[in-house]
């Protein structure tokens, strides 16, 4: 009898775990370090309209408590910034979606910050962290999920941390910022880079009826079933558990929201209706697509070959993911490394089919002799100065 009881209990526990994992796996917005620090710097933000733009200017200092920085997962010190964003005042849906990542959902370096919160702190869902770390085994086709418990970026309780520049930014639900949000009304919390508003998860059950009840809106993403296709050396293997962005898939109708984690509806600020994005507590938390055209002010810097100097994460893959420089100002890969990563047929140059991300986007500009291939010489001429110097040293 005891054996039967134990067996039944085990089946029950497995069933509960399977249901939980099926939605989020290792993804979590409640795993950050405690926020006990009150900053000496004061929040300073102004949001004004000018012509056909909405201007957000701030010092990027949050108006709430934060975690301790530096910390074991994030060695950077939070400091004031000079941030200025021009946001479309009258946004329109584009003919196609734009991913926040350079090569599509969960692939490549970050291409755009998603938006800015009303307190002037930027919203940036993705991180430049990949399978294989930053060495020659780096595989940018598999971006590590910043909010996975398998990836330690030193996030605080607001799912935020600090970049090497000192800029504090959110990767997911900013708990301290939204702690006073009402559960019985819609609350706008920011603006997306394409100009559409961002709300926290509470919305009307009927998106076109402001008299309908307020409910918790949910995303339409879930974990994929089965195992990843990689061999564990050049690409990840193992079950889809939320460690990578591509461990998730969009299932239309699974939740209330579309693939961009938004929907069209009435809001208190837009009584005639608007498309709006939603920050959810389940994946993806911050949206990963734009339905409109994002402002260039939100493009992630670093030039044609750059990545904005993001910090290496410590993750469960050991040295593959450990930051390579003590000061954490990680450099983009050299020209030679880029050629090696993209040159799949090993002919020493990159074809238009082999090119990825910003190089693919600017292929015609880099291909100076217009022969349909990018050589090391052509790529070096297009690279930022610091990359040229490092390429010659290697």
What are these regions (language model features)?
Residues 5-14:
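Sec-dependent N-terminal signal peptides
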Residues 19-21, 394:
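Boundary of Sec targeting at the N-terminus
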Residues 21-154, 158:
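Solvent-exposed N-terminal domain segments of exported/luminal and surface proteins
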Residues 73, 153-160, 258-265, 348-349:
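Short, recurring structural edge motifs at helix starts
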Residues 117-121, 164-178, 270-284:
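Extracellular/lumenal glycan-associated surfaces
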Residues 194-196, 201, 205-303:
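Extended, compositionally biased non-globular segments
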Residues 338-339, 349-361, 376-387:
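Amphipathic regulatory helices of Ca2+-sensor modules
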Residues 343-347, 367-371:
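Acidic carboxylate motifs that coordinate Ca2+ or other divalent cations, activating on Asp/Glu
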């Amino acid at each position: 009898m005891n054996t039967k009881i134990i067996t039944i209990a085990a089946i029950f526990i497995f069933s509960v775990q399977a249901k939980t994992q099926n939605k989020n796996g290792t993804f979590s917005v409640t795993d950050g370090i405690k926020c006990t620090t009150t900053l000496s710097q004061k929040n300073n933000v102004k949001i004004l309209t000018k012509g056909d733009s909405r201007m957000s200017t701030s010092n990027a200092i949050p108006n709430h408590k934060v975690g301790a920085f530096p910390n074991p997962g994030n060695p950077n010190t939070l400091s004031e910034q000079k941030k200025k964003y021009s946001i479309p005042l009258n946004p329109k849906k584009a003919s196609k979606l734009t991913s926040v990542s350079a090569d599509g959902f969960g692939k490549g370096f970050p291409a755009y910050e998603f938006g800015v919160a009303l307190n002037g702190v930027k919203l940036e869902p993705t991180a430049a962290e990949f399978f294989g770390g930053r060495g020659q085994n780096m595989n940018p086709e598999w971006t590590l999920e910043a909010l996975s418990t398998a990836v330690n970026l030193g996030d605080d309780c607001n799912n935020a941390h600090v970049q090497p520049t000192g800029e504090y930014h959110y990767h997911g639900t900013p708990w301290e910022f939204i702690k006073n949000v009402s559960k019985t009304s819609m609350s706008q919390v920011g603006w997306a880079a394409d100009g559409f508003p961002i709300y926290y998860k509470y919305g009307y059950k009927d998106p076109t009826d402001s008299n309908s009840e307020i409910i918790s809106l949910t995303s339409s993403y879930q974990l994929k079933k089965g195992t990843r296709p990689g061999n564990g050396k050049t690409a990840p293997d193992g079950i889809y558990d939320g460690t990578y962005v591509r461990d998730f898939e969009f299932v239309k109708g699974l939740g209330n929201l579309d693939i961009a984690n938004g929907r069209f509806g009435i809001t208190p600020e837009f009584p005639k209706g608007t498309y709006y994005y939603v920050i959810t507590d389940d994946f993806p938390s911050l949206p990963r697509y734009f339905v409109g055209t994002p402002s260039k002010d939100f493009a992630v810097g670093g030039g044609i070959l750059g990545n904005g100097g993001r910090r290496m994460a410590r993750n469960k893959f050991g040295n593959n993911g450990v930051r390579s420089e003590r000061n954490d100002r990680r450099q983009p890969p050299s020209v030679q490394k880029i050629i090696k990563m993209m040159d799949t047929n090993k002919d020493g140059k990159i074809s238009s089919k082999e090119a990825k991300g910003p190089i693919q986007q600017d292929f015609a500009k880099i291909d100076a002799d217009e022969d349909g291939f990018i050589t090391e010489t052509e790529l070096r001429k297009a690279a930022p100065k610091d990359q040229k110097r490092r390429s010659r040293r290697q």
